[in-house]
UniProtKB/Swiss-Prot annotation:
Pfam families linked to this entry: DUF1292
Top-level taxon of origin: Bacteria
InterPro entries: UPF0473
NCBIfam families: PRK13678.1-2 (NF010215), PRK13678.1-4 (NF010217)
Record protein name field: UPF0473 protein SUB1774
PANTHER family: UPF0473 PROTEIN CBO2561/CLC_2432, UPF0473 PROTEIN CBO2561_CLC_2432
Native organism taxonomy: Bacteria, Bacillati, Bacillota, Bacilli, Lactobacillales
Organism of derivation: Streptococcus uberis (strain ATCC BAA-854 / 0140J)
Family per similarity comment: Belongs to the UPF0473 family.
Length: 101
């Protein structure tokens, strides 16, 4: 998923840790409430401080998460590539977000 990142506003920053223990900072671009339809929420992330490519686009990563019983956000999970309904919903919400930008 790519996003033309020509707007200028602050994003919340989170740290992701990969399987090797490497930490990477990401900016939260958008959160999506998918609890009613899929029983979980979604977050779209961009690498913190990343620059646009020659086409003016920046790489976006999407994850799902469920809230813990205490109301805190749980662990991020990759979205299955074969989950067309989830990806369609994410794309629809993201496109609406871009239209509002």
């Amino acid at each position: 998923m790519a996003h033309n990142h020509d707007h200028d506003h602050e994003h919340e920053v989170i740290t992701l840790v990969d399987e090797q223990g490497n930490e990477s900072l990401f900016e939260i671009l958008l959160t999506i409430d998918g609890k009613e339809e899929f029983g979980k929420n979604y977050v779209l992330l961009v690498p913190a401080g990343s620059e646009e490519d020659e086409a003016g686009e920046i790489e976006i990563q999407a994850y799902s998460f469920t809230e813990n019983e205490d109301g805190t956000e749980g662990d991020l999970q990759p979205i299955p590539e074969d989950s067309d309904a989830e990806w369609d919903m994410i794309e629809e919400v993201f496109n609406s977000f871009l239209d509002e930008e």
